[in-house]
């Protein structure tokens, strides 16, 4: 069975967020088109996503030194264990759908914490004499992102770092197909905001048939 991991990184729902509204249109249509596929919604604002901190580094260090998981402190076990769970869930999925806003030219920090949890040598990539090699070569990914301005082209394009970062990470993991669906300009041209949103929703529904 095809497994889709629907990863949302927004504190608002589809009634308040452009990206979440487009994401909902996409995933609802996808479920209709692929009723036999399993879709798992991972809401990063509602799930426990540990950040790399002193407990995580300490736990990793103990494990590398030969200690067992049970020998870690309670804090270390909770954080390292959860990061392991997130990584295993990530590598078991066949498709990834990331839904984010653009905040200060990137995405919410909880998504970076999540990526840090799943970027694990030997799991999502490996080191070789020729350099790192991605291990997720049979996956595909989509990023749905709302941007108040216009960043796909023009002078502001080089300022966009959220989608570009995800693109680099997906390449690093070996994911061969990574697409972007952007909701752009609703803040720059507020009188066209609803039209922009409607057009993005229509594109999302179309894409759900081929993704």
From Swiss-Prot:
It catalyses: 2 a quinone + NADH + H(+) = 2 a 1,4-benzosemiquinone + NAD(+); N,N-dimethyl-1,4-phenylenediamine + anthranilate + 2 NAD(+) = 2-(4-dimethylaminophenyl)diazenylbenzoate + 2 NADH + 2 H(+). It is an enzyme of class 1 (oxidoreductase). Its EC number is 1.6.5.-, 1.7.1.17. The keyword Ribosomal protein does not apply. Binds 1 FMN per subunit. Its cofactor is FMN. Signal peptide: none annotated. FMN binds at residues 17-19, 102-105. GO terms for molecular function: electron transfer activity; FMN binding; oxidoreductase activity, acting on NAD(P)H as acceptor; oxidoreductase activity, acting on NAD(P)H, quinone or similar compound as acceptor. Transmembrane segments: none annotated. It holds the Pfam family Flavodoxin_2. Keywords: Flavoprotein, FMN, NAD, Oxidoreductase. HAMAP family: Azoreductase_type1. NCBIfam families: PRK13556.1. Belongs to the azoreductase type 1 family. Homodimer. This is FMN-dependent NADH:quinone oxidoreductase. It comes from Geobacillus stearothermophilus (Bacillus stearothermophilus). The gene is azoR.
